[in-house]
């Protein structure tokens, strides 16, 4: 049975004081209401250690928004998985639309990260999704297929148990356009089928992978989304940055 996951992406938001306050609030409230859902938070890199210490021993998992695919080395400005392990972080987000769009991260670059992280016993949250122009030109499935096949190329089947996917309809974020639960379900179903075709025996593996929806998830739409067969949770931005709205997702 697939896990239902609510993952809060704090992005480059919150001061240290705000992040610490939110982490304490999450520790106090979320474990008691999460029930059968897995809760995750992804603070900014500078706040990871503080938040990890606060949530240590709770059911809330702390993840990193990014890292580089290398051990300790001369990569100025980057963070190594080795450094993340030191502070208890074992989940890393890869391929978020903002990193693809603004920092030029390609499917192949994401693949390098994913393979390195999985081999080093991390769980990976891999984000895929199409832009507004790609959707309006009818390229949604083509784009997603490339992101899945190129991003997950060469990954051994034994590592797929540590893989989570998230679908981000970039066209529905900050554009005034809204993806309906049925539109999201259609794409999630396609993603699952694409995974099932990656290698022999992948069909059963694809059925066990949680696929989250990441298009402006809020307390007032989460339940309708979760009713869909292939939507297994949410990758949440703004609503995860206040305890009232984050708690409303559970």
Swiss-Prot record:
Substrate binds at residues 9-11, 174, 216, 237-238. Pathway: Carbohydrate biosynthesis; gluconeogenesis; Carbohydrate degradation; glycolysis; D-glyceraldehyde 3-phosphate from glycerone phosphate: step 1/1. SUPFAM superfamilies: Triosephosphate isomerase (TIM). InterPro entries: Aldolase_TIM, TIM_sf, TrioseP_Isoase_bac/euk, Triosephosphate_isomerase, Triosephosphate_isomerase_AS. The active site is at residues 96, 168. Its EC number is 5.3.1.1. Gene3D superfamilies: Aldolase class I. It is found in: Cytoplasm. One of its GO terms (cellular component) is cytosol. It holds the Pfam family TIM. Signal peptide: none annotated. The keyword Cytoplasm applies. Keywords: Cytoplasm, Gluconeogenesis, Glycolysis, Isomerase. It is an enzyme of class 5 (isomerase). GO terms for biological process: gluconeogenesis; glyceraldehyde-3-phosphate biosynthetic process; glycerol catabolic process; glycolytic process. The keyword Cytoplasm applies. GO terms for molecular function: triose-phosphate isomerase activity. It catalyses: D-glyceraldehyde 3-phosphate = dihydroxyacetone phosphate. Belongs to the triosephosphate isomerase family. Homodimer. Involved in the gluconeogenesis. Catalyzes stereospecifically the conversion of dihydroxyacetone phosphate (DHAP) to D-glyceraldehyde-3-phosphate (G3P). PANTHER family: TRIOSEPHOSPHATE ISOMERASE. This is Triosephosphate isomerase. It comes from Leptospira interrogans serogroup Icterohaemorrhagiae serovar copenhageni (strain Fiocruz L1-130).
């Amino acid at each position: 049975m697939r896990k239902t996951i609510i993952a809060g992406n704090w992005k480059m938001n919150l001061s240290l004081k705000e992040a610490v306050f939110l982490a304490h609030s999450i520790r106090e409230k979320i474990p008691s209401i999460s029930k059968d859902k897995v809760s995750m938070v992804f603070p900014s890199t500078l706040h990871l250690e503080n938040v990890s210490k606060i949530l240590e021993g709770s059911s809330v998992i702390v993840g990193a928004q990014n890292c580089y695919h290398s051990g300790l080395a001369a990569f100025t400005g980057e963070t190594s998985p080795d450094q993340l392990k030191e502070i208890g972080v074992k989940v890393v987000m890869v391929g978020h639309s903002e990193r693809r769009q603004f920092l030029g991260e390609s499917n192949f670059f994401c693949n390098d990260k994913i393979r390195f992280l999985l081999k080093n016993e991390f769980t990976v949250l891999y984000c895929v999704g199409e832009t507004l122009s790609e959707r309006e030109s009818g390229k949604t499935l083509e784009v997603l297929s490339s992101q899945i096949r190129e991003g997950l190329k060469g990954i051994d089947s034994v590592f797929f148990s540590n893989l989570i996917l998230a679908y981000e309809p970039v066209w529905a974020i900050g554009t005034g356009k809204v993806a309906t639960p049925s539109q999201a379900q259609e794409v999630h179903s396609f993603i699952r089928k694409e995974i099932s075709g990656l290698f022999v025996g992948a069909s059963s593996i694809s059925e066990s992978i949680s696929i989250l929806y990441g298009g402006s998830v809020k307390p007032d739409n989460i339940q309708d989304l979760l009713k869909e067969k292939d939507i297994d949770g949410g990758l949440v931005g703004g609503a995860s940055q206040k305890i009232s709205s984050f708690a409303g997702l559970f």
